[in-house]
């Protein structure tokens, strides 16, 4: 039994080390270069007659991602809005894919008095996405799909699902004067508004903010709105 567990562990390490090309029908292991990875994936896919490749997104550390930050800590330095996705555009950047999500604000529940990191530079969108209209903002997110040499390359962040159209979101934002924004703690500050105005996280975690939303507000938009009005 011990030898079997050792063998399974060794296999798992090997898979992580070599990288993965994932297609609709097979998973093939290859040595992935550190530079020009997206072009390499496209070339390998074409050589194998594939038209689509799926790869994992890199790990990202987000401002506000510390699990001990409470909901009230986040409210003290964030803008809280209800918004919906208007458009999205994916771009290849530094051997990874970034998707710029354009949101329209439906309601502002709370405006931040100051940014948690005044010296942090705001996200810089591609010129093609400018100008940003009043009442809209742009959020960059790792992952998305781009086409390189006729091959669709999809990068997936399993801990931070893609934003969806026809879905209302409650967002905890670091909103900059430029009209760009980041969500507090990445996926931690993103909630879907579902039936009966319930607010549910896009990705379940043990983060204190999500626990507070459940225990203090009962995942209720109405209860949250009342709490924010008296701040």
Regions found by a protein language model. Name each.
Residues 2-231:
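Transition segments tied to proteolytic processing and entry into folded domains
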């Amino acid at each position: 039994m011990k030898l079997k567990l050792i063998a399974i562990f060794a296999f798992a390490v090997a898979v992580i080390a070599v990288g993965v090309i994932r297609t609709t029908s097979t998973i093939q292991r290859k040595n992935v270069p550190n530079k020009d990875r997206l072009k390499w994936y496209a070339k390998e896919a074409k050589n194998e007659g594939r038209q689509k490749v799926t790869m994992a997104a890199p790990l990202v550390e987000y401002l506000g991602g510390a699990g001990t930050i409470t909901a009230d800590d986040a409210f003290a330095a964030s803008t809280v809005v209800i918004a919906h996705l208007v458009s999205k555009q994916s771009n290849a950047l530094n051997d990874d894919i970034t998707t710029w999500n354009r949101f329209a604000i439906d309601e502002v529940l709370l405006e931040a008095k100051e940014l948690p990191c005044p010296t942090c530079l705001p996200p810089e969108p591609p010129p093609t996405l400018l100008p940003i209209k009043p009442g809209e903002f742009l959020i960059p997110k790792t992952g998305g799909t781009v086409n390189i040499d006729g091959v669709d390359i999809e990068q997936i962040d399993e801990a931070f699902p893609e934003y969806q159209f026809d879905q209302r979101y409650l967002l905890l934002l670091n909103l900059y004067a430029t009209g760009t924004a980041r969500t507090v703690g990445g996926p931690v500050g993103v909630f879907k508004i579902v039936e009966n105005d319930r607010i549910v996280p896009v990705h379940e975690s043990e983060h204190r903010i999500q626990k507070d939303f459940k225990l203090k507000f009962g995942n209720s938009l109405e209860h949250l709105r009342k709490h924010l009005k008296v701040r």
